[in-house]
Amino acid sequence: MKNFTLSLFLFVTTLLSAQRDSVFIKTPIYSCVYSEILQQPKRVWYTVQCPSGSYPRKGMDFYTNDSVKTSDGKDYEANVWDKGHCAPAADFNCTRETLWQTFSYLNCILQHEKLNRGAWRLLEAYERELAKTTKVEVEIRVVYGPKAAKLPTGATIPTAFYKTIKFGNKKEVYYFANEAPATTDFTKYKVQ
């Protein structure tokens, strides 16, 4: 009986501690598929809500989620990886609450700092410009190629990103390798 109880305990413990590869999350401002194994999102969808918002982000920092194993601040220390918002803070800065929701690690990718602060940031500004006159829907597909590196802290570094922007009857697709870009001109990364 003791062996059965111990076996049952070990089975339940293993089952409960198993990390999930694809957890679907829906928040009021974005949806995502998150991998606890990679400790990174695999896909994120959102509609730009505040193209002209101005709520300040002072004092806000990323936070973990109690029900999903995510990356955390240790993954971003002393390296070239920024805490890249998938659903950008500036697209949701109409209120403190919408802005705060963008700071979840569920919405955060290990993104090369020069990409995040360059061409990617300028593409986000372009989304907001479009959203001033039409509905803008965005999907980000995060690529983890066969050579995707895993940090000693546990998170996997994406190898690339596809960003699809839908507005009016148009669709634009951009592809960015997760590295320092050759140019900040985001139009050079348009693939469709």
Please annotate each region the language model reported.
Residues 18-20, 25, 35-36, 104, ...:
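Structured catalytic/translocation cores of nucleotide/phosphate-coupled proteins
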Residues 23-82:
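Short, His- and charge-rich active-site/binding loops that engage polyanionic ligands
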Residues 66-192:
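Domain-level detector of nuclease and nuclease-like folds
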